[in-house]
Amino acid sequence: MDTRRTRSTRWAGAAVAAGALGVALVIPAGQVGAATGDTYQVRNLVSDVPGVAQVTDPHLVNAWGVSFSGASPLWVSDNEKDVATLYAGGVHGGTQTINPLVVNIPGGAPTGQVSNPTTSFVVHGSDGSSAPARFLFVGESGHLSGWAPTVPPPPPSTQAQDAVVTPGAVDKGLALGMTDNGPMLYVADFSAGTVDVYNGLFQRVITAGNFQDRKLPDGFAPFNVAVLGGKVYVTYAKQDADRVDEVAGAGMGRLDVFSLDGRLLDRAAGHGQLNAPWGLAIAPAGFGAFSGDLLVGNFGDGRIHAFDPSTLVPTGVVSGEDGRPVTIDGLWALQPGNGTEGGTDEVLFTAGPQDESHGLLGSLSLSD
């Protein structure tokens, strides 16, 4: 069954990403934490729609998860095209380029992805070739796959390889953590409402805490997962009746933090501003008052909220140069730049604007 997203979940008031900035509903005073006074500039770098961004790439449709490998180009999961594409440039608005490599993702509909710096997570080609995956992917079809440049030869390969297929799973997020028992993959299965853990042999592992939150409202499920600073951050959204897509709305989101073995450490007390949250990143140095804060991007209304990463206390909302909250239609990933794609003081974002029928890669930086 194709579990690819089929409907819009955004409020009608969300701005189209082609405009980059927009105004959504006003959040009551005190709900988002202290105002910072800093404002941020949004740049559109790549889109599938001509004229929207610096460059046009027809593969970039419903741009979702992202990852880097050291100083590599940025890898982006193109959910509606069943591929991953690579980008470099765009540093502080500089020249943006498209890498010619396009990687096919088995099962299609890719969502989360991670780079793998370890020698674990070996993938195998039908020709007998094998190597550790350099990048790993999950998708709404329940496929966990990996790409290695030599599998199959000749390099660079244009095909990721299946590692685990879970019938009925609708995987929305993927993270990699380094534990005392070796590297582990964390997969957010939105349909089952679980965070599934796999070791370096792609074997399922039951953790001590098993990522349980007994105070989570009924019908909320893991929407994304990220390992940041040695902790596992999990965002939750409300499931629709089919347990495939999220239900958007003010307060329709939760945020928890766990240990690497799945023990609940804390919950975000202020979740009224969360609206189907998916994007997770620690803001880099040079990102103004939010430097070092946990950034949480709402898919539901396109806003980006900041939290103290230690206490999960809200610290504010990212605002544009007009002083109003930045609103990015169909916002998915948040990722600090690495100097190859985006500056090291910038935050990259992906989005699936206009009901996920288009794609956008852009950047956020402190206003000049």
Roles of regions detected by a PLM:
Residues D2-G33:
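Secretory targeting and sorting signals
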